[in-house]
């Protein structure tokens, strides 16, 4: 590229994107492994905000997936899962075609969610700098060096009139990382404080933790902490399954999509020998950094484990509610065991929970039982409702991308270096 063309491109970028960072509006979008719908937030970041919270959520919107799209997404998440679909005359008949169909449908649905959010908040699309759209993970294979998030950002940019940042994970993987978890970098930027270590526990489809060490007072005084590149001293990784298995088992045995408040699980009894068997999964023996997903923990895996258990323990009787209680305990024990590694050696006295699992009262109670050294509460006590944390995180990651700042934490993902994440599709 010659100097003239490069200068022209640089000027265009500065005029269209790299401006008004101090008070920029961003939209973050997230649909997790639990596939319960799309969350979207409109938020404002400010480098000039000297408060403890240089981010403000202005509006939120959540919308369930159309039933057919959700069905196809769930099928795509499973190897050969698409074979269970019965296509109509105008629908695809191969897995690759279904992937393209779902990518388009997902993007059109995402566009509708964004436009509804803009309408409800009376916000002009021209005032929004970018959308951070994670897309839907249909395959995460860090051991093979790839992760696939399904979304067509071109459609979203065209239908909303807003530039879109997507495909966040693969740049981290290009430098040797696992591409996950990415949210701990945001946790560090927003929630770290100078006087104590904090632990953030995200309970989405998969559970993951972020251990945030106390930041230096020099950074706090200079107001560099929240907006500069996050520190590699953060520890973060996936700890195991959460809502993914809980929701799948609930859907299979009840007429509900999820166990509201954990009341069904609470009505059952933990099957200790089954719990011990589930904890033998190889993932729990791995050291961090590590990540997992539906490829490791899914309904087929659970049913296979139950079959093995029944064959080995024919005299043990249990109900479907007992299995739900056991799955809840699996999440609580696998997460708390990792958190306790850091609580015991730190000054932290609180674990802040976010994600849909934060609304599961029974799970929160079980976490508190296993985390006796600290108080378990939600991120609402830090000023951000737990169900919106991940969506805000991807708004923040989009902002990092447009600012040319790194968005990954090598100590968390295992990458060889910090890199600017994502690809930008301009409106």
Curated annotation (Swiss-Prot):
InterPro entries in the record: Anhydro_N_Ac-Mur_kinase, ATPase_NBD
Involved pathway(s): Amino-sugar metabolism; 1,6-anhydro-N-acetylmuramate degradation; Cell wall biogenesis; peptidoglycan recycling
Catalytic activity: 1,6-anhydro-N-acetyl-beta-muramate + ATP + H2O = N-acetyl-D-muramate 6-phosphate + ADP + H(+)
Annotated ATP binding sites: 32-39
Record-listed E.C. numbers: 2.7.1.170
Keyword annotations of the record: ATP-binding, Carbohydrate metabolism, Kinase, Nucleotide-binding, Transferase
Highest taxon listed in the record's lineage: Bacteria
Record's keyword annotation contains Cell wall biogenesis/degradation: no
Kinase in keyword set: yes
GO molecular function, one term: kinase activity
Gene3D superfamilies: 3.30.420.40
GO BP: any one term: 1,6-anhydro-N-acetyl-beta-muramic acid catabolic process
Family assignment from sequence similarity: Belongs to the anhydro-N-acetylmuramic acid kinase family.
Role of this protein: Catalyzes the specific phosphorylation of 1,6-anhydro-N-acetylmuramic acid (anhMurNAc) with the simultaneous cleavage of the 1,6-anhydro ring, generating MurNAc-6-P. Is required for the utilization of anhMurNAc either imported from the medium or derived from its own cell wall murein, and thus plays a role in cell wall recycling.
PANTHER family in alphabetical order: ANHYDRO-N-ACETYLMURAMIC ACID KINASE
UniProt protein name: Anhydro-N-acetylmuramic acid kinase
């Amino acid at each position: 590229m010659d100097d003239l063309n490069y200068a022209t491109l640089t000027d265009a970028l500065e005029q269209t994107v790299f401006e008004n960072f101090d008070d920029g509006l961003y939209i973050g979008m997230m649909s997790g492994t639990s596939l319960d719908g799309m969350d979207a937030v409109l938020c404002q970041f400010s480098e000039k905000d000297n408060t403890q919270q240089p981010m403000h959520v202005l509006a939120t919107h959540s919308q369930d997936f159309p039933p057919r799209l959700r069905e196809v997404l769930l099928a795509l998440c499973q190897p050969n899962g698409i074979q269970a679909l019965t296509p109509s005359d105008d629908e695809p008949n191969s897995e690759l075609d279904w992937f393209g169909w779902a990518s388009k449908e997902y993007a059109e649905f995402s566009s509708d969610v964004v436009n509804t959010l803009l309408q409800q908040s009376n916000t002009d699309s021209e005032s929004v700098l970018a959308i951070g759209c994670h897309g839907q993970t249909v395959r995460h294979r860090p051991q093979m060096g790839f992760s696939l998030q399904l979304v067509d950002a071109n459609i979203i940019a065209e239908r909303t009139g807003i530039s879109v940042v997507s495909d966040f994970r693969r740049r981290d993987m290009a430098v040797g990382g696992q591409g996950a978890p990415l949210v701990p970098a945001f946790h560090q930027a927003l929630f770290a404080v100078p006087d104590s270590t904090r632990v953030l526990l995200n309970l989405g489809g998969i559970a993951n933790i972020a251990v945030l060490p106390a930041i230096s007072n020099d950074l706090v005084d200079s107001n560099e902490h929240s907006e500069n590149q996050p520190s590699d001293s953060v520890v973060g990784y996936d700890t195991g399954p959460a809502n993914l298995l809980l929701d799948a088992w609930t859907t299979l045995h009840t007429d509900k999509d999820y166990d509201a408040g954990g009341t069904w699980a609470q009505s059952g009894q933990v099957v200790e020998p089954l719990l011990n068997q589930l904890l033998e999964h190889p993932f729990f023996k791995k050291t961090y950094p590590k990540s997992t997903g539906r490829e490791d923990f899914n309904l087929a895996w659970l049913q296979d484990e139950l079959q093995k258990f029944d064959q080995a323990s024919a005299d043990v009787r249990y109900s479907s509610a007992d299995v739900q209680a056991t799955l809840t305990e699996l999440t609580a024990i696998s997460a708390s065991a990792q958190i306790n590694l850091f609580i015991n050696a730190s000054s932290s006295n609180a674990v802040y929970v976010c994600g849909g699992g934060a609304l599961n009262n029974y799970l929160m109670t079980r976490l508190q039982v296993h985390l006796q050294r600290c108080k378990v509460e939600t991120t609402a006590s830090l000023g951000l409702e737990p169900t919106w944390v991940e969506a805000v995180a991807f708004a923040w990651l989009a902002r990092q991308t447009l600012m040319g700042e790194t968005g990954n934490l090598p100590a968390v993902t295992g990458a060889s270096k910090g890199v600017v994440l994502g690809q930008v599709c301009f409106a």
